[in-house]
């Protein structure tokens, strides 16, 4: 998946934009950082819609309850999606509200 493939929507609770990309069994939630143009926060959810930390994506020393990756660049977001695609073997698809 390329950056240009990600489909954006208005965030329902803020002035941010958001996108969700499904790569079974995971969903990647991407939200623009409102006060940091060009940066994004990323969360990964499992099939039960629970936040998860994945090895190779989240830093090893991450607090297990700190599951949102803040201040990610476009390249880092695409890298996260590609890593999940590699882990799962499934093609990433946009999810619409």
Stretches found by the model and what they are:
Residues 17-19, 37-45, 50:
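Membrane-helix boundary/juxtamembrane interface motif
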Residues 3, 45-97:
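Mixed-charge, Lys/Arg-enriched low-complexity segments
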Residues 1-37, 63-65:
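Negatively charged, low-complexity tracts enriched in Asp/Glu with abundant Ser/Thr
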């Amino acid at each position: 998946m390329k950056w240009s493939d990600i489909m954006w929507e208005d965030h329902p609770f803020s002035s941010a934009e958001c996108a969700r990309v499904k790569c079974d069994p995971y969903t990647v939630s991407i939200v623009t950082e409102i006060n940091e143009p060009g940066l994004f926060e990323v969360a990964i959810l499992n099939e039960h819609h629970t936040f998860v930390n994945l090895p190779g994506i989240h830093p090893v020393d991450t607090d297990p309850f700190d599951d949102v990756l803040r201040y990610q660049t476009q390249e880092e977001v695409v890298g996260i999606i590609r890593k999940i695609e590699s882990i799962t073997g499934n093609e990433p698809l946009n999810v619409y509200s």
